Amino acid sequence: MYSPIFLRTENQLNKLLKSQRKSRKDWGILFVSLWDDASKTLVETINSKLSTDEEKSKPLYIVDSFKMPHAFVIFKTTKIPHLIQFKRGGLESEDYLSKVYEELGL
């Protein structure tokens, strides 16, 4: 289960990525565009269904294309919504909407 956290600056994302190299923790990044209806619906669903209080939940950092357009280049994101999951074994990338919902447990 994930707990949503909205990122506001690219500097925040860069710090998270840098710390990930050392810590190897499980967490995710969701790239969205709030101009897109599918992304809007997904973010509303995340806000209503995913909890922010659970201690065992993994952080899900949500990145908006309007606020951080250059962040999309890092993972070669061309479709939105795009879910990147950092797991101990590596990195998983998913950009099919139904699979994004499935991976998030929605």
Question: What annotation goes with each model-predicted range?
Answer:
Residues 20-34:
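Short active-site neighborhood of thiol/selenol oxidoreductases, capturing the structured segment around
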Residues 2-17, 95-96:
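Short acidic-hydrophobic, aromatic-tinged amphipathic segments that line or gate anion-handling sites
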Residues 16-20, 71:
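CheY-like receiver
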Residues 26, 44, 81-84:
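Proline-centered helix-kink/hinge sites
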Residues 73-78:
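A short glycine-leucine-enriched loop at secondary-structure breakpoints
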Residues 79-106:
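Non-catalytic, surface beta->alpha helical segment in thiol-disulfide oxidoreductase systems
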